């Protein structure tokens, strides 16, 4: 398994009166090319979990394997691990600091010992991937729109050419148009480059649409794990822990209560439409 997490627990301020358990007995694995969504309410442990995956935080207990390497082993170079695991923090545009878009994207690869030409190649490739025009290369990143800044920040990670891309709430604070553009671009990058992609979000609609697997976090533990259909089949369980389900799933549940035979794992409007039309045709023939 490219990513394997075994019995991981994490305690903030361990050994002090302020100790707080953030993760408890976490177990899961992620295969090559999987797109995984991690969802949960604020304080559920989502961000703490992803910071374990590239060594920013070290588990209080348990092991984490990236491509077969135990990254909790003190002998392992975390610098090498971070070349493989790219992490885009929430509001990544706040981490932009260089004079130009080009320099900001180039910062990471410039520290990999690459030649100037190789760095340039990676920067322009990353800009193309995220949809940032070359004309913006010499522009200050602080003059860009919120969505463009977000793309520049993601490009800075992609220029490192990671095998695993982790994004923490990548659409937070964006308007609906910017949000949709970023999500579409992330899915496009995943489909094209076949890297493992992990997307942290609290938005069920987003996750249902693009993830292959969903991990539901609750109070530092994994509440549910499975495909979108398997997870959203447990709508009542999700609502009990304060999470909403996709609107179409809620609609399907209400229609079932009224006798319309729609499966509990409907995820798209198209699916719901097919079941409703089938039902209506059937009632007309009675």
UniProtKB/Swiss-Prot annotation:
ATP binds at residues 40-47. Residues 3-244 form the ABC transporter domain. Belongs to the ABC transporter superfamily. Energy-coupling factor EcfA family. Its EC number is 7.-.-.-. It comes from Caldanaerobacter subterraneus subsp. tengcongensis (strain DSM 15242 / JCM 11007 / NBRC 100824 / MB4) (Thermoanaerobacter tengcongensis). Forms a stable energy-coupling factor (ECF) transporter complex composed of 2 membrane-embedded substrate-binding proteins (S component), 2 ATP-binding proteins (A component) and 2 transmembrane proteins (T component). The keyword Mitochondrion does not apply. It comes from the Bacteria. GO terms for molecular function: ATP binding; ATP hydrolysis activity; ATPase-coupled transmembrane transporter activity. It is an enzyme of class 7 (translocase). ATP-binding (A) component of a common energy-coupling factor (ECF) ABC-transporter complex. Unlike classic ABC transporters this ECF transporter provides the energy necessary to transport a number of different substrates. Keywords: ATP-binding, Cell membrane, Membrane, Nucleotide-binding, Translocase, Transport. This is Energy-coupling factor transporter ATP-binding protein EcfA2. The keyword Plastid does not apply. One of its GO terms (cellular component) is ATP-binding cassette (ABC) transporter complex. Pfam families: ABC_tran.
């Amino acid at each position: 398994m490219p990513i394997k997490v075994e019995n991981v627990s994490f305690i903030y301020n361990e050994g002090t009166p302020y100790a707080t358990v953030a993760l408890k007995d976490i177990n899961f694995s992620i295969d090559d090319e999987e797109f995984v969504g991690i969802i949960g309410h604020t304080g559920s442990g989502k961000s703490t979990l992803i910071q374990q995956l590239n060594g920013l935080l070290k588990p209080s207990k348990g092991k984490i394997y990236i491509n077969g390497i135990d990254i909790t082993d003190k002998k392992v170079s975390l610098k090498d691990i971070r070349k493989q695991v790219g992490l885009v923090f929430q509001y990544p545009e706040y981490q932009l600091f260089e004079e130009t878009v080009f320099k900001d994207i180039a910062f990471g690869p410039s520290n990999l010992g690459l030649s100037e030409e190789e760095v340039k190649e990676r920067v322009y490739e990353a800009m193309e991937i995220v949809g940032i025009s070359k004309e913006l290369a010499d522009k200050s990143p602080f003059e860009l729109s919120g969505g463009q800044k977000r793309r520049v920040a993601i490009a800075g990670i992609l220029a490192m050419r990671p095998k695993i891309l982790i994004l923490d709430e990548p659409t937070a604070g964006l308007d609906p148009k910017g949000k949709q553009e970023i999500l579409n671009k992330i899915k496009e990058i995943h489909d094209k480059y076949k890297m493992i992609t992990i997307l942290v979000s609290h938005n069920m609609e987003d996750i249902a649409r693009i993830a292959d697997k969903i991990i539901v976090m609750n109070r530092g533990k994994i509440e549910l794990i499975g495909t979108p259909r398997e997870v959203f089949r447990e709508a009542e369980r999700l609502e009990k822990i304060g999470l909403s389900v996709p609107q179409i799933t809620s609609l399907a549940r209400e229609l079932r209560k009224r006798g319309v035979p729609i499966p509990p794992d409907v995820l798209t409007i198209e699916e719901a439409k097919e079941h409703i039309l089938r039902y209506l045709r059937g009632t007309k023939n009675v």
